[in-house]
Design a protein with these regions (language model features):
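N-terminal acidic, proline/glycine-rich, low-complexity intrinsically disordered segments
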Residues: 1-5
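Calycin-type beta-barrel ligand-binding domains and close structural analogs
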Residues: 10, 15-20, 24-28, 32-34, ...
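A generic structural signal for short beta-strands and their flanking turns/coil linkers
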Residues: 43-45, 58-60, 77-79, 88
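N-terminal glycine/threonine-rich, aromatic-flanked beta-hairpin/loop signature
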Residues: 47-69, 73-74
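Short, solvent-exposed loop/hinge segments that bridge or flank secondary-structure elements
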Residues: 18-23, 27-57
Length: 214
């Protein structure tokens, strides 16, 4: 996949933060150490973020998969993400995939990734994430309003999600909260998942003509 550069005249400091975040996200993350140290509490999971071509959103986008290490071809979560410059923050629109199983493995096989088109996705309303840079890391959380609704265990819940990312790590905590009682229904009760980057796909992120990397 050959990324297209953004014109230098359009590059701002907030654009650079957006590109840095995209590059840090682009990779194969594994919580192998956490799962090995605490096998009763944590399964071994991979989180993949693979850059999409610039033309997909006329901007920066990523495809993601979350899979158990023992079953890499059957992701339990897939998505497409569009990064949007909000000045001092970065807004990530989240999209679901229609017939998602057809694209399983796209994070590892570029031939599958190329079959994903804008017609394949639909916006997950209320489920966007908002990130802000904090020195050597970005911190993000789901947009306010408790509108990212997910039905599980016969209960209507909203997503409570927080993420911290550095160049080499991804720490996330996703919990489903009852819309009426605000009590946790699903998600980790042992604390956040802690991932380390095993492989980077940062070279596939569209480049900036005057990019200073960090």
């Amino acid at each position: 996949m050959s990324p297209n550069p953004l014109p230098s005249s359009e590059v701002t400091s907030s654009d650079r933060d957006l590109i840095v975040l995209a590059r840090w996200m682009a990779g194969d993350f594994s919580n192998a150490k956490q799962a090995f140290d605490n096998p009763k509490d944590y399964a071994h999971i991979h989180v993949y973020f693979r850059p999409l071509p610039f033309e997909f959103f006329s901007g920066i986008g990523l495809y993601s998969e979350q899979v158990y290490d023992y079953d890499l071809w059957r992701p339990y979560r897939q998505g497409v993400h569009r990064l949007v410059d909000w000045g001092d923050r970065i807004y990530i629109e989240n999209y679901g995939l229609k017939d998602a199983i057809f694209y399983a493995g796209a994070a590892r096989e570029l031939s599958i990734l190329k079959t994903i088109t804008p017609d394949c996705i639909e916006r997950r309303e209320g489920c966007s994430m908002i990130f802000k840079r904090d020195g050597d890391r970005f911190r993000g959380c789901v947009e306010p309003g408790n509108r990212c609704l997910i039905e599980k265990k016969g209960c209507q819940t909203y997503l409570d999600s927080s993420v911290e990312i550095t160049e080499t790590t991804w720490v996330s905590l996703d919990r489903g909260m009852d819309v009426k009682t605000h009590q946790q229904v699903w998600g980790s009760t042992f604390g956040p998942l802690r991932f380390e980057k095993k492989e980077s796909f940062d070279r596939e992120v569209p480049t900036l003509a005057t990019d200073g990397n960090h």
